[in-house]
Design a protein with these regions (language model features):
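Substrate-binding/active-site clefts of carbohydrate-active enzymes
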Residues: 1-168, 188-197, 201, 212-213, ...
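Active-site-proximal helices and loops of the catalytic beta/alpha 8
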Residues: 86, 90, 159-267
Length: 270
């Protein structure tokens, strides 16, 4: 018997965030980063380690990239949030995932694409095209991994995410799991987005990237910025009183040529 986690789902919604825009603006916030907005699987027991169903309320376990996550609200509420934020001079940055789907969705995604002869095109990686331990060609946490080296798969993923941006005038995308997808896929994604909005920006999550290592993703027509993982160490040193170490680290970062790109200063507004 499967028990339901109590509570089984955490998180706010579009309407609640809309109500807090003035509060956030008073704090000096000019860009709001929100979770992936697409429909997610309702529960997961893939590891068989518990009889309690767990929920991907974080948004990273997509079940359908064409539908909105019902827990976040309806499309009218999402549009209202964007319109209200824009009216206050604020931007909305939506988290997106192109690397993987939610647990148990292999059959669904493998049924979507066909070639010119009517043969099925598998969107999800199997043992025939997996390289164990490889960042790009193996699954992350056993999640169904998209075969993004296949152009047909990339084109479909890019189309889904571009349609969301175009329909709702989303300002920016925060891109998940950058290191697990080919640079050619990110280039195709950026090209598609900038055809709709030439000023559209993407900030990537590349685990381990920092001021001294941009992983080759900056200045290549893909990511406009990367999350600065080095800052985690700076912050820990600061709160533990190691101020001299923080000063030295910040000085090195300030002197680095790509410093303004690595930690996303381009998203600051005048």
């Amino acid at each position: 018997m499967v028990k339901k986690a109590v509570p089984s789902y955490h998180g706010g919604d579009f309407a609640g965030l809309n109500q807090k825009l003035d509060y956030l603006k008073d704090l000096g916030v000019n860009t709001i980063w929100i979770t992936p907005i697409v429909e997610n699987i309702t529960e997961d027991q893939h590891d068989n380690e518990t009889d309690t169903a767990t929920y991907g309320y974080h948004g990273y376990w997509a079940s359908d990239f064409t539908k909105l996550n019902k827990h976040l609200g309806k499309e009218q509420q999402f549009k209202a949030l964007l319109d209200a934020a824009h009216s206050k001079g604020m931007k909305i940055m939506v988290d997106v995932v192109l690397n993987h789907a939610g647990y148990g969705r292999e059959d669904y995604f493998n049924s979507i694409l066909t070639d010119a002869d009517g043969n099925s095109i598998s969107m999800i990686r199997d043992s025939n095209n997996t390289i164990s331990g490889d960042d790009k060609y193996d699954s992350l946490s056993d999640l169904p991994d998209f075969v993004t080296e296949n152009k047909a798969v990339t084109d479909q993923l890019v189309t889904w995410q571009t349609e969301w941006m175009s329909k709702y005038s989303i300002d920016y995308y925060r891109v998940d799991t950058v290191k697990h997808v080919e640079t050619t896929t990110w280039a195709a994604f950026k090209n598609s987005l900038t055809k709709v909005n030439p000023d559209f920006k993407m900030i990537g999550e590349y685990s381990g990237a920092g001021y001294a290592n941009n992983a080759g993703e900056l200045g290549t027509g893909t990511m406009d910025a990367l999350l600065d993982f080095d800052f985690n160490d700076f912050a820990q040193n600061f709160v533990t009183g190691n101020i001299s170490s923080v000063e030295n680290s910040l000085q090195k970062r300030n002197n680095a040529n790509q410093q303004h790109l690595c930690h996303g200063k381009l998203f600051e507004q005048p």
